[in-house]
């Protein structure tokens, strides 16, 4: 646990969790201070007295972005930072994509620098900042684990854990630029934490006619990730099936998915994962090779291909795929090496 003292007696409590995939990288203290100055706590008070707590990121003078699932029932929204409180007067809501932009006059907070989710790749380090539990601001370090195309942009999956109260918090790249909003998590192992991309809301920040007086949003509207199981985006359905180790059903889903998105690598990655789960490395390798034909620099496909070659016991092809991966994504290549060393601590046997 580390502590950093800020102006007005504001103490930022930072719990830094560095996963093995972050390779010991730390955030520069100056960057840490700059990021913390953009984060605010969000209190959303409903007519029945119910209080919803979340996090927001200052994205322009007097403008804060958070998740709509934090503010959707609110009649009154309060923004807090450093012991001070401001009232949000207006909001621009996009419930489907789960972002709400808030107009907060006289807000004393430094806007975050905006980056691009589209510039990220699996394996790259990121940091997640949010008021977990509605108490102190916490920072989690991790990496991008997967990227999924949805509605023309990239939903980011990371290994940076977050809990209630952090919704609407910021996901930042290594340079300290805002690339996404911490939004939801799926049941499963580590790395099932998802952020919506900045590209979804950045063009709406200055859309003044789109802002309305703060009031409860229309009932019945749901974000894309809150739909019933068979209406969820394919990447979420695939993740649930993989968590449950329902490999045959995942293969069936991948087939339907591929018919709808013929130029996407995601169905092939899902197919490869299913074959790997079924201990069919030859077919897994074919699936990952198909993904690489669509995107020769797809590091997730190279990762899966190398892992399939390892399952086959083909050391020569494994080394070739691992070397290609290391050129494109050194962090992910190190993850692969760690995984293989755990499974086969001595060596990968040559194929007979």
Spell out what each predicted region is:
Residues 57, 162-182:
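Catalytic nucleophile loop of clan PA
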Residues 26-31, 70, 110-155, 162-166, ...:
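Flexible, gly/ser-rich surface segments that form the specificity/activation loops bordering the active-site cleft
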Residues 270, 304, 338-339:
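Canonical tetratricopeptide repeat
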Residues 25-32, 110, 132, 178-243:
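C-terminal cap/linker of serine protease catalytic domains
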Residues 49-53, 60-129, 134-138, 152-155, ...:
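Conserved active-site neighborhood of the chymotrypsin/trypsin-like protease fold
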Residues 23-57, 64, 76, 214, ...:
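N-terminal activation segment of mature serine protease catalytic domains
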